[in-house]
Amino acid sequence: MKKLALIFAGLSLLAFTGCKDDETPEQVFPLVGKWSPTKEVKTQVSATGAGFSDEIVYTDCQKESRWVFNENSTGQRTNRDLAGSTPTCSTISQRNFSYVYNPSEKNLEIKYQGTVVVEKSKVILLDDKTMNLKFEDTTDPTVYKSTTYTFKRVTQ
């Protein structure tokens, strides 16, 4: 009987100490912060399967552009590029927006101030240094179009 009790005690001890939760919780990084675009990829595929994908690497001037996501669901997009008769790096557009971000589904909706258009995107990657946003154009059901932006975090 003592052997049976020892075996039971040993198995119980093994059951309590032998199991370990191997799943590490997914780390959640904030969308809030200031982001610098580094490149974009434009993809287009027709219903016949013909298509292309172009990668556009931004210039140093274009990398000075900023997408700012504030905690109160507002933001600002500032685009910079070479402009003028003697091209200098200048702000070519600046737009305020509001946004709704669902981190569990990774959906992001951006509405620019003064418009009724809502741009819908998917957060493909979001970590402490990098974010990829994919915008899909569904206006033509026979052609798939998407633009994926890659950003580098400037600040949080």
What residue spans do the PLM features occupy?
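Lipid interaction determinants
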Residues: 20-96, 100-156
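Positively charged n-region of N-terminal signal peptides that target proteins for export
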Residues: 1-4
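C-terminal motif of bacterial Sec signal peptides marking the signal peptidase cleavage site
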Residues: 15-18
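Sec-dependent N-terminal signal peptides
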Residues: 6-10
